[in-house]
From Swiss-Prot:
The lineage of its organism: Archaea, Methanobacteriati, Methanobacteriota, Stenosarchaea group, Methanomicrobia. GO terms for molecular function: homoserine O-acetyltransferase activity. Residues 47-353 form the AB hydrolase-1 domain. It comes from Methanosphaerula palustris (strain ATCC BAA-1556 / DSM 19958 / E1-9c). The gene is metXA. Homodimer. Keywords: Acyltransferase, Amino-acid biosynthesis, CBS domain, Cytoplasm, Methionine biosynthesis, Repeat, Transferase. It is found in: Cytoplasm. Pfam families: Abhydrolase_1, CBS. Its EC number is 2.3.1.31. Transfers an acetyl group from acetyl-CoA to L-homoserine, forming acetyl-L-homoserine. This is Homoserine O-acetyltransferase.
Length: 490
């Protein structure tokens, strides 16, 4: 399939109608969430994927904004024919709580004062960020996500989703992440924060409308950027080459190409990011710890999703052993977990760069989809003793076109469709057994969606009850949802 762009993308906003209670016990009012979406949500809303950004990312994950030449930060894997195929999936990305790209953060106006929050903004956590994302997903009318995916701090959000809202996540993809921030990771973040707060322009966080602490923020970015690279990538990219000169100057000017590169990264970063947001988001990363009583096994116990954990061979900030610890903890909980490594010299940033490997690994993971991954588990059912009138009312109130019919022992004995109800009215039938189909075509949770779709096509039906070994109904899948996922839909 030819890979393409999602084209022009726009950012939308949504404001919470109720106060947001934070993990710290503080509350935020009128929280605004900035988000973008790509692709089309199918009829039964079963194809939604939430993408979570890293520390300094934003909601602009794919496509272009107007005349901007720079695409979204994960454009290489989001779009037609890519891993997050927008011909199949409805992809959502929102700016995190505490950020500075449209979602409420320290640079936002405090409704109580009419001025920017600054450091009066409460400290937030990864769990708080996920709770805000959950509110957005509820707003979009989505009861369950087909997948949640992200790298670095985005991967932490994925892991938090798995334990905070286990029933809402069918598949999870966490890349270059950890289940618990380590002392080394906390140490690097603290150096960055001190660089900012030591800048005289920081003014205790009250610098809005005045000179911003660009020197401190630039230095924080320079330090952090070193951790995103690797020794090998810096050797390849820079070596010991000098910048714009042939000989050493024997002074303290910027001489080496690697120095010039870091200065450029720091300076450009100050033009797009808020220093206070950097303080808050790094603190949220430091607080991240999913272990319970020092046990990741206990921490991941609520997980129900099928999980893909990806690490980067040259990542020394979030090294592979930390991803392997997550895999071990999930395996100990008998979760369906898969693991792979990006073989790359680019270090931690490989999750943004190695789009070829990512497209391959993520596509294989998402495409191997079982019925249980996409079925609707909130299925209205009716007893075989019910009347046609009861069935008709239930279809109207529940907004469904198919009603599985159950025997007294709760086993499946038939199915009634909206066409059957119309036929009953036309023919004057009154009894349910006069119209229901007793030879029900079914599927199981362990079948692939391709097999289920083929069965519906063969029998010219639009839905399949999903049954267990006792013939009990555990879900239902529709042709509309499956067609989108397997690429047969519009």
């Amino acid at each position: 399939m030819q890979r393409g762009s999602v084209g022009i993308s726009t950012t939308s906003t949504f404001t919470l109608a109720t106060p947001l209670l934070l993990e710290s016990g503080a509350s935020l009012f009128s929280v605004q969430i900035a988000y973008e979406t790509y692709g089309t949500l199918n009829h039964d809303k079963s194809n939604a994927i939430l993408v979570c950004h890293a520390l300094t990312g934003d909601a602009h994950a794919a496509g272009h904004h107007g005349d901007e030449s720079r695409p979204g930060w994960w454009d290489g894997v989001i779009g037609p024919g890519k891993a997050f195929d927008t011909d199949k999936y409805f992809v959502i990305c929102s700016n995190v709580l505490g950020g500075c790209k449209g979602t409420t953060g320290p640079a936002s106006q405090n409704p109580d004062t009419g001025k920017p929050y600054g450091t009066s903004f409460p400290v937030v956590t990864i769990r708080d960020m996920v709770n805000v994302q959950k509110a957005l997903i509820d707003h979009l009318g989505i009861s369950q996500l087909f997948a949640v995916a992200g790298g670095s701090m985005g991967g932490m959000q994925v892991l938090q989703w798995m334990v905070s809202y286990p029933s809402m996540v069918r598949k999870a993809i966490a890349i270059a992440a950890t289940g618990s921030s380590t002392p080394q990771q906390i140490a690097f973040n603290e150096v960055g924060r001190k660089a900012i707060t030591a800048d005289p322009a920081w003014c205790g966080g009250d610098y809005y409308g005045k000179e911003h602490p660009v020197k401190g923020l630039s230095l924080a970015r320079m330090v952090a950027h070193i951790t995103y690279l690797s020794d090998a990538s810096m050797h390849t990219k820079f070596g010991r080459a000098l910048q714009d000169r042939e000989f050493r100057g024997f002074d303290f000017d910027t001489e080496f190409q690697v120095e010039s590169y870091l200065h450029h990264q720091g300076t450009s970063f100050t033009k797009r990011f808020d220093a206070n947001s950097y303080l808050y988001l790094t603190k949220a990363v430091d607080y991240f710890d999913l272990s319970v009583d020092d046990s990741l096994i206990s921490g991941f116990a609520p997980t129900k999703a099928t999980v893909l954990i990806i690490s980067v061979t040259s990542d020394w900030l979030y090294p592979p052993y930390q991803s392997q610890e997550i895999v071990s903890a999930l395996s100990a909980n008998e979760c369906d977990v898969h693991y792979c490594e990006l073989r790359s010299q680019f270090g931690h940033d490989a999750f943004l760069i190695e789009t070829g490997q990512l497209n391959y690994s993520i596509s294989r993971f998402l495409d191997h989809t079982l019925v249980r991954d996409v079925m609707n588990t909130q299925v209205p059912v009716i007893s075989e003793q019910s009347t046609i009138a009861v069935a008709a009312r239930m279809m109207i109130t529940q907004g469904v076109n198919h009603l599985p019919v159950l025997a007294p022992d709760q086993s499946l004995v038939g199915i009634v469709t909206s066409w059957d109800i119309a036929n009953a009215v036309a023919c004057g039938y009154t009894s349910l057994d006069q119209i229901m189909s007793s030879q029900v075509i079914t599927t199981t949770g362990d079948e692939t969606i391709e097999v289920a779709a083929s069965r519906m096509e063969q029998h010219r039906i639009s839905a399949l009850p999903v049954i267990d070994q006792a013939q009990h109904v555990i879900g239902l899948i529709s042709s509309d949802g499956l067609s989108k996922l397997i690429g047969r839909g519009p």
